[in-house]
């Protein structure tokens, strides 16, 4: 590990994008939200309101720790599959599938930027970044949590500039700030600087949406 932290000296196979379930689990685990309970009934995490009405059914979203269970416990309706996981090529389960199709579409990036699960995970990471003595250490640690890799100097410089730019914007636009910090059930500490948390969350979201996070190499 000391000689090859990035695992570049030993080839282990071709690059492969993580499945939708893995990407969601990684976001929850990295932010510390993941509920590790094993077994039990299916759960109903965040999904767009009214999606089940097409079949005259009602989707009652769960609350608390149930929102953060592993993706394998997400309730599955074959006629209306969970949109977040389906966007990342999860099969419909109406027929047997030997191998998943793997696509790369703009919708996948939009999911990672706008789905409440990922915004909430980014916001929690943004809150945790406040505990570090400086932004460099906060961003480097968050990058490591999400990607399992050591951040490069040029990557760190880009994210530092992004954090500074977003912080300035959030300080001037409190409504935009509230849009970030109020997404999801996890509560913000009342003493936290909401503009700083939101700016940190944008950085975490950017890392979460990067190829290095969602692709295994």
Predicted segments, located by residue:
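An acidic, gly/pro-interrupted, aromatic-rich
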Residues: 1-137, 186-217
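C-terminal structured "cap/appendage" subdomains that terminate the fold
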Residues: 130-200
């Amino acid at each position: 590990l000391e000689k090859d932290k990035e695992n570049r000296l030993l080839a282990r196979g071709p690059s492969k994008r993580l499945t939708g379930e893995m990407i969601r689990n990684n976001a929850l685990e990295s932010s510390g939200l993941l509920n590790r309970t094993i077994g039990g009934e299916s759960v109903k995490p965040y999904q767009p309101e009214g999606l089940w009405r097409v079949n005259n059914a009602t989707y009652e979203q769960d609350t608390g720790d149930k929102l953060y269970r592993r993706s394998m416990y997400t309730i599955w309706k074959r006629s209306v599959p969970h949109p977040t996981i389906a966007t990342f090529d999860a099969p419909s389960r109406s027929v047997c599938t030997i191998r998943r199709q793997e696509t790369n579409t703009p919708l996948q990036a939009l999911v990672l930027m706008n789905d409440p699960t990922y915004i909430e995970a980014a916001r929690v990471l943004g809150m945790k970044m406040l505990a570090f003595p400086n932004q460099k250490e906060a961003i480097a640690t968050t990058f490591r949590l999400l990607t399992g890799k050591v951040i490069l100097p040029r990557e760190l410089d880009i994210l530092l500039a992004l954090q500074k730019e977003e912080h300035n914007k959030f300080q001037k636009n409190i409504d935009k700030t509230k849009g970030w910090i109020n997404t999801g059930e996890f509560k913000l500490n009342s003493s936290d600087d909401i503009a700083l948390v939101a700016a940190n969350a944008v950085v975490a979201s950017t890392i979460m949406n990067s190829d290095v996070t969602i692709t295994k190499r």
